[in-house]
Amino acid sequence: MTWLLAITTMSAFAQQATVTGPDSFLKVNVSVKQGIPVYSVTYKDKTILEDSPLGFIANVGDFSRDMTFTGQKENKIDKTYTQDRIKQSQIHYQANELTCTFTNKEKKNINIIFRVSNNDIAFRYEMPKYGDTGSIVIEKETTGFDFPSFTTTFLCPQSDAMIGWKRTKPSYEEEYKTDAPMNVRSQYGHGYTFPCLFHVGENGWALISETGVDSKYCGSHLSDATTDGLYTLAFPMPEENNGNGTASPGLALPGSTPWRTITVGENLKPIVETTIPWDVVEPLYPTEHTYKMGRGTWSWILWQDGSINFDDQKKYVDLAAAMGYEYVLIDNWWDTNIGRERMKDFIDYAHSKNVDVFLWYSSSGYWNDIVQGPTNYMDNPIIRKKEMKWLHNIGVKGIKVDFFGGDKQETMRLYEAILSDADDNGLMVIFHGCTLPRGWERMYPNYVGSEAVLASENLIFQQHFCDEEAFNACLHPFIRNTIGCMEFGGTFLNKRLNRNNDGGSIRKTTDVFQLATAVLFQNPIQNFALAPNNLTDAPQVCLDFMKQVPTTWDETRFIDGYPGKYVVLARRHADQWYIAGINAQKEPLKLKLNLPMCTKGDKVMLYQDDKKLNPHAEEITLKKNDEVSITMQAEGGFLLVK
């Protein structure tokens, strides 16, 4: 631990505390070494994290060095809760809790709370009031994650601030590198966005993220690694939000930081199935509204800006009605190209087809150069509340708010304010061009999704992203989508990604691959990339599946896969299982799958690519208990519906 050698202050002795998960396999050791609070993590006695620093530097004192371990207490957590909008509807969370008290040389205390379940660690700092001091500014966290040198990484770089379209980055849309060594500098030199996946050789896997971020803190990310494999928690860059607002979060005392989470397993199953983002947070406000999840159409993804007019939007309402979908999303420029006066007429037309409406807004404000309208409605509370009341009165069911400015506390306040005001008016909210959701499905009852990923629009913009579509799609179930909703906006049935299905980017993946992503990518409101022409030019088997696919799930199980190569998941909606797989490799992949939800004699519907890569569906009878043999074509997929 070379980072320890630079510290010369020695404590008289190193006290230690240990907490394990209920099954005792996952263990956290906490101690003080050379005045620095540290923790380490093992799973089944194999090292996941070596001694890693804890603490922070604040305006009220330094809690990163010259610290003494002065107390500890233990507790057990056992709670059951229900949650819509995530990968599982019924959750039983059991964990052992350890509270460690550390005292700095000024005799000021902090508590570090660890909650350890069988495969998850969540920890945070709690600060009391210090005399008459009623607030604190956290200037820097020294929280670290020190991996063994042989660890490889699956990470998405943090971009420069104020770059990209109209200076709107960072927005969690950079390209991943897989199985990369730790000692390579990130693309921009700013570290990596959460969540961060690590393969600790034969010792196992670890996923690092955070949850419970609201208006009282900023969003964080990981730094670049030191030569010793140490990543530390990094705050937003000062340049974010066009330089407005501080990068250092402030909060009232007593107070606490968000939870930082580490999910650990000897394989990828605990990573994919984790519910830790929601286990340690609680709803922030009740709602008097009933929000309906479902599927939608949106013209912008294929027909782009020119389609935001009354007549084209009616075509997408008709498409939604033909598919039995609940929603249509009207994207940017509706305020000028359709007009506020005609919007009520449009919504009345949609309602006549049993389709409800989402409308797009810019987050607006003074932090980028966006001109697409509507602008200057969401950043000002007086204007925002008036606008949302109007939306409620004309029958709009939700909004999609785009182009945020970064991860500073100032922006987190805006996310929360939009959500809270929207709930007052019965509006659901999707975020786009945005930060990562951090437990928000449980915290905010009207939150229904975030992009925060290199999403479907990029397939339209560049052929490169079509060429890499299968690779990227085989990453998301292991990384981005495992910690929160992912509003991807995909499932294309056009072969060519333009309005007339005759030009633009060429889709490389098969139709069944596209169908499988409707199950693999989890978001409670799914705006699919279908087009009106698909009603006549897409295979009927694809349309039939897309008419019945759900968007909410009661259970999710990892079946098989490796990030960037292939993935197979099983999701249950009510009493029906959807087992979906995709293959990113350039040759067919034969798999013998263990499916505990299947038994000999079950009749299931199998969707596969034939040898000409055309979709084919047939009912088959399973010949064995728990086992099915599948072949996925190159850049193809399969589905089993039971």
Model-derived features with residue positions:
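An acidic-aromatic substrate-binding cleft motif
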Residues: 252-327
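N-terminal accessory beta-strand-rich subdomains and adjacent acidic, glycine-rich linkers
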Residues: 16-273
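C-terminal beta-strand-rich structural cap/linker in extracellular carbohydrate-active enzymes
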Residues: 620-642
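Catalytic cores of secreted or luminal carbohydrate-active enzymes
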Residues: 512, 516-558
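Aromatic- and carboxylate-enriched substrate-binding clefts and catalytic-loop regions
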Residues: 329-510
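Bacterial Sec-dependent N-terminal signal peptides
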Residues: 1-16
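Edge strands and adjacent loops of beta-rich recognition modules
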Residues: 82, 86-92, 545-569
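Carbohydrate-binding surface patches
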Residues: 562-600, 638-640
